[in-house]
């Protein structure tokens, strides 16, 4: 049954929309609806085209912790026993000495 009203309506079931709904319900909100234009995992937004890359190395300790928490959350999500997130790796290449020093600070 489709609801015709809700306290919170989130447009888009991408990472931002789903995360917003997740945390609102975790905080006790019960009247939250997520609206998506197409079938889940086949949506037209940027999340469905993203490779699953989350950089956990950052010069900012807060952003590094946020990335780690994101990976922990994404890793825990599943749909009927199937994972919803497939992590991939990445590499950053320093082409200059300044960039090398910047990368060293991030580690």
Q: Locations of the language-model features?
A:
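Dinucleotide-binding Rossmann-like beta1-alpha1 core, especially the glycine-rich loop
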Residues: 51-107
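A secondary-structure boundary/capping signal
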Residues: 11, 36-37, 50, 87-89
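Short, flexible hinge/linker loops that cap or flank conserved catalytic cores
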Residues: 1-3, 26, 85
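Short coil/turn connectors at secondary-structure junctions
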Residues: 5-6, 29-30, 88
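Flexible, glycine-rich phosphate/dinucleotide-binding loops
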Residues: 17, 41, 100
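Glycine-rich FAD pyrophosphate-binding loop
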Residues: 25-47
